[in-house]
A protein has these predicted regions:
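Hydrophobic alpha-helical transmembrane segments of integral membrane proteins
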Residues: 23, 31-32
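Short polybasic linear motifs
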Residues: 2-8, 12-16
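Catalytic-site microenvironment of enzymes
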Residues: 5, 39-438
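N-terminal signal peptide c-region/cleavage motif recognized by signal peptidases
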Residues: 35-37
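A periodicity- and composition-biased signal for non-globular, repetitive helical segments
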Residues: 10-14, 21-22, 263, 280
Length: 438
């Protein structure tokens, strides 16, 4: 489902200390330093201050031309990063925070570029294998959102009368479960990031009240509410409990999944599974719409406001320098073509400035989401179907039937099998076409 704009707030500033060497007026020195300390770092909710020294691994791994091209065409279009990134002839000067700079040295030529150190392997670096195109490939499957009782908190479910509830987190988990043996049969080593309906983080909303209040204040909410009256309360977004819940499932949960992916699984590819939706009103009296569509997302299209946060700027540079873009785009295009052919869905088109069309099919868009930002490897982020479309609702209610059934004059497989088939065929086709082509 398309992510709402996140509220953000400034993180805890870096502590600075004044020694006796500060002079005869230590208190005055402290007061002079205080403004710099208070505003030296700006972080998104629940984020740690980035360790900029980690970017030293990318010194001289990319030419100036390649850096400028990716920055302007994919990651920070329309000069979004100009305030913090100054490109010179042989280096880029990057603001770490309000007071410190990181210096990135460019490679003098593509031939002299140093090898990019990363935990994932590009498909082109694998030996050709048409029989088992995913042999030696580590794939992490990230079923989007939460299921079970958590779905109501996340507002990712709806029900019409006595029908089967439509719950995105349960549906993505079911698709993931079906994907595992299919990908394994093609040689892949597959790991589920989430294998049950509940969260992978151990933090719960009631532990995030302090951060929630800070987030609301940073967003300019003056009348912060201590509680709200339920999902239909029009003022719920101004309350601490609602904001704490949002930070729990939208931010903390994704940070934990990122730790699992980057520190434990270390895959070559992540599949983020989602079902899209249009506004449906209330969960107990939803509006079904006639539109149904498909699109895929890769990381990019950062705004000036987003790059004003130190951790987002750091993560953007990591993705750019890690050179995930070519892999993400090419693989996403293969999956998009496969899913479009099997589902018959048209491409979704963004009209907002927070997304940029990339590639050639019309199905793939660059967008800055927390998951595709924090996962330090190629991410294929699928938004298939519109959950509250009339067509999808009818097919979902039919369940996991065998074979084909007639829907609106078209013989269709069950919705889960269709999702799985489109994904598997696209990934297999990409690796068959790309392996051994370095």
């Amino acid at each position: 489902m398309k992510e709402r704009l996140l509220r953000r707030y400034a993180g805890t500033p870096t502590r600075r200390y004044v020694s006796a060497a500060a002079g005869p007026f230590p208190l005055l020195s402290l007061l002079l330093l205080l403004p710099m300390a208070c505003f030296s770092q700006r972080l998104t909710p629940l984020s740690n201050a980035p360790d900029w020294d980690q970017l030293n691994r990318f010194q001289e791994t990319m030419t100036r031309e390649a850096f400028v091209d990716l920055l302007g065409s994919v990651y920070a279009p329309n000069g979004a990063g100009a305030q913090w990134i100054k490109v010179e002839a042989t280096r880029a000067l990057i603001q770490e925070n309000a007071s410190d700079q990181f210096v990135l040295q460019f490679a003098s030529s593509a031939e002299s570029s140093k090898t990019v150190p990363r935990y994932w392997t590009a498909a082109a670096n694998l030996a050709a294998n048409n029989d088992l195109p995913l042999s030696g490939v580590k794939i992490a499957i990230d079923p989007g959102h939460l299921g079970g009782t958590w779905a109501k908190m996340e507002e990712r479910w709806f029900q019409i009368g006595d029908s089967i509830p439509v719950t995105e987190g349960d549906m993505t988990l079911r698709v993931a479960q079906l994907l595992v043996p299919r990908l394994q049969s093609l040689g892949a080593k597959v790991t589920l990031v989430r294998s049950s309906p509940g969260p992978v983080t151990t933090v719960r909303p009631d532990e995030l009240n302090t951060q929630a209040e800070a987030s609301l204040r940073e967003s300019g909410i003056k009348n912060i509410l201590p509680s709200y009256a339920g999902p239909d309360d029009p003022n719920r977004e101004d309350s601490i409990p609602w904001e704490a819940q949002r930070l729990f499932y939208r931010v903390g949960e994704i940070h934990t999944r990122a730790q699992i992916i980057n520190e434990k699984i270390k895959p070559d590819l992540v599949l983020c599974l989602h079902f899209d939706a249009e506004p449906w009103g209330t969960s107990t009296n939803p509006v079904l719409v006639s539109v149904n569509h498909l699109h895929l997302l890769i990381n990019g299209a950062y705004s000036t406001g987003e790059l004003g946060f130190d951790d987002e700027r750091f993560a953007m540079l990591w993705k750019l320098l890690d050179q995930t873009y070519p892999e993400e785009l090419a693989c996403s295009e293969y999956v998009a073509q496969s899913m479009a052919r099997i589902t018959g869905l048209p491409p979704y088109r963004y009209s907002s400035p927070n997304a940029k069309s990339v590639g050639w099919s019309g199905y793939v868009w660059a967008r800055n989401l927390l998951a595709n930002r924090l996962y330090e490897c190629p991410v294929i982020f699928i938004e298939a179907y519109v959950m509250n479309s009339q067509e999808f609702f009818a097919r979902f209610q039919a369940g996991e039937y065998e074979g084909f059934r007639n829907f609106g004059g078209v013989m269709r497989q069950n919705i889960f099998e269709e999702y799985v088939q489109g994904t598997v065929e696209g990934i297999a086709a990409y690796f068959r076409a790309t392996r051994g082509k370095r």
